Amino acid sequence: MKNNQEYILVVDIGNSYTKIGIFEKEKENTTSIILFPTDSETNIATLSKKMNVFKKYNIKHSIVGSVVPKLKPTYFKTIKKMFNIEPYYISETTKYSFLIDESPNKELGDDLKALCEYCVSVNKNCIGISFGTAIASVYLKNNSLVGASIAAGLGFGLNKLIEKASLLKKSKIDKFSSDFFGTNTISALESGINNLRSGFAYNFYNQAKKDNLNSDLKCIITGGESYNINISSFEYEINKEAILLGFKKIYFLNN
């Protein structure tokens, strides 16, 4: 056992990747975190090996968010077996620090609800943008969810393009490139990735700002692809763990 400090285990199961982190109950920085590809056929034995790194911590709380519903029972059983606690799951009766209408409450993914929760902890007027398998954004006005926008992710689109273009199949694309203008096919693709990231954030922010001209609108950017965002027209915060933190906040709001 690491110490007597209580920890919360937070699980975010995405379509492509699963991220698991632990936090001290009273802190917002992750103590330990693991990331691995989501496997719809995973089992208790496999998960137990992955999460064994957390056994040394005094884990007394847990929340599991998932956009892959079939995996929830496996995670429930694994966490209960390893830590002797029952994880909390988001449901239609879950309370939030923001207002959400009935329809989006039923349809919006757990991860985006967690992003909303983190956003309103920063400011009552806020947009959150997640760059991952999908590009997703949420807009909150006066602590109320106005709406969201979802598009195919950069990695998915790039992989499909490389599959179709024979000249690109042996080329290495640097998704971390910050160049705005490409001088050949590869650097042009790298420029496109950079401009798509920054352009999506810029446009979504501006549309929200038009709807809320007199507010101090904040912008939170997160997700595995949230790097090299080049925007000078407004301030933004990049927090890779915003969604995990949102789940943590949801847990303690409901328990």
From Swiss-Prot:
Binding residues annotated for substrate, in chain numbering: G109, D110, D111, L112, T185
Main location class: cytoplasm
Annotated residues for binding of ATP: D12, I13, G14, N15, S16, Y17, T18, K19, T133
Keywords: ATP-binding, Coenzyme A biosynthesis, Cytoplasm, Kinase, Nucleotide-binding, Potassium, Transferase
Pathway: Cofactor biosynthesis; coenzyme A biosynthesis; CoA from (R)-pantothenate: step 1/5
GO cellular component: cytoplasm
CDD domains registered for this protein in UniProt: ASKHA_NBD_PanK-III
Record flagged with keyword Cytoplasm: yes
Family the UniProt entry places it in: Belongs to the type III pantothenate kinase family.
PANTHER family recorded: TYPE III PANTOTHENATE KINASE
Subunit field text: Homodimer.
The protein's name: Type III pantothenate kinase
Species, as recorded: Malacoplasma penetrans (strain HF-2) (Mycoplasma penetrans)
